[in-house]
Amino acid sequence: MKLSKNFSLEELIKSDTANECGIKNSPNSLELKNLTNLTTKILQPIRDAFGKPIIISSGFRCIQLNKKVGGASNSDHLFGAAADIHTSSNTYEDNKKLYDTIISLKNKGIISCRQIIWEYGKKNVGPKWI
């Protein structure tokens, strides 16, 4: 199911952990509405400005999946209001460009979000996602 020009519901609910553990990671109607807002108002504008594919490493998480991956009990992922993303190359340099694009869009008022976190945003150190 397409939620925006470049993003699908399947991308936002996909989880290797859920598959391995037999967890059904399906949003309810309110969570689906939130995911649609997330894609149309935040992710798609980022993708359009960045001009290259963006990979969603974690989107919606049901309660059971969130517990399994050690997510915070009040995580926005539980409500369909958060996504961890990175570039297709997942290099420091490309992720830095993506991060800078996001900050620019936020500063211009094009996107509105509560948090922007660059996890392990140091060259050659640990996982990289925004």
Locations of regions flagged by a protein language model:
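Active-site microenvironments of hydrolase-like enzyme catalytic domains
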Residues: V69-D84
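Extended, low-complexity, intrinsically disordered C-terminal regulatory tails
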Residues: K41-G70
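Extracytoplasmic cell-surface/polysaccharide-interacting catalytic and binding patches
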Residues: M1-R47
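Structured loop/turn residues at beta-strand edges in well-structured enzyme cores
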Residues: K52, G80, I111
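Catalytic cores and adjacent binding grooves of peptidoglycan-active enzymes
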Residues: N74, T87-I130
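A broad, low-specificity signal marking well-ordered, structured residues that form hydrophobic/aromatic
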Residues: I54, A83, W129-I130
